[in-house]
Amino acid sequence: MNRIIMKRVFIIACMVAVGMTLHAQTKAEQIKHIRQVYAQAKQKVDKMGQDGKAAHTVHIHQIEMGEPGGEYTPEIDTDTQFYFDRIGGDSEQGITGKAVCYFVSVNWMADGHTNYRKYLFDPVKGHLLFAFMKAETHAGFKVETRYYYDAQGNCIEQKHKVQDQEATADSHSWNDWKSELESGRKNARLFDLMLNTERPYPELASALYPSSTPKAKLLKDIRAAYAKAKQRIEQNDKDGGVKNDIEITIHDQQSEDFPPVTTLWKCYYEQIQQPSPYQRYYFISEKTESMYGESYEEYLLDPKPGSENVIFIYNQGYAEGEEMEMRYYYDENGHCFESKVSDIVESEPVPARNKAGYIFSIFDELMQ
């Protein structure tokens, strides 16, 4: 009986050992694959925009400054770069290929130090494969982390350095594999929102009835708010001023039969401290350029406390030698009470407002 038991124990132990070896081999193969994908992604990044091919990139630059006080003005300067491909398009059928992000780099400067994050995504399926971070506090505490993930989001390997020395996961509290996974997925959500949102844009809700405020007063208030916003933008853009803005630049070519398009969004916001801290947008602009033409749009938000409604939209475009110009004025209930458009275009205040809501949602996702 003892021999039988011992034999069974031996067999089970062998099976466990073999299973662990296979698991280790599988893990090693996964890490090897991730490193190969990383090397391929870096090659594509280095060649981006060369060989006569259009670039497929999104660049986000955010400057966030607190109010001056004490010995210094707190400032965070962040650059985020997305690299992507278009997959599965059919230009003859008018089908735009899906934009698939394969690499993201984030550089942010805080407390006088430049910090880095890099995210590698599967170039076909889009899930996170690898996350890297290198950061330093104002006191000189340096941390470096590497996390490797499988297709289900499980961490299969992690490496840490503290003060340039090999360390364990519990040697610092800067991040962990779950926080980096969520950060990578957040970037993926933001990317999909910017590049893969289908038209028409989601419709914004509005009140059943227009505002009871006289039209003349509404126009006066909107024009005053516009002038004030422009003054604040001028101060924001001055050298040495308190800057709070985000700039998003998209270089894209939806298919080989379409020309490259560059889109620039710029969002200006203010820091609100009461009743709880948050960032409040007050002006957003969009500029689009391609060989077919160009357009420029402005979105003014209601300056009233607690309001996030767009109250004015301006659109100017040039295409095939024709100039188009549109102005839409909205009350606090979302109704367009005044529009001024060129003769060659039809007035479409509702789609214009819906597009404004879509752009706001991008900045909402970014600022979370």
What do the PLM-derived regions correspond to, one by one?
Residues 5-18:
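Sec-dependent N-terminal signal peptides
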Residues 127-128, 155, 310, 336:
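Hydrophobic "anchor" residues
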Residues 121-127, 151, 300-308:
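A short, structured loop/turn motif at beta-sheet edges
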Residues 26-79, 138-260, 320-368:
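Long terminal segments
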Residues 52-116, 120, 233-295, 300:
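Surface-exposed acidic loop/strand-edge motifs in secreted or periplasmic proteins
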Residues 20-24:
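Sec/Tat signal peptide C-region and signal peptidase I cleavage site
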Residues 127, 136-138:
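Short helix-loop boundary/capping segments
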Residues 105-109, 132-136, 159-162, 285-289, ...:
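Beta-turn initiation residues at beta-strand->coil junctions
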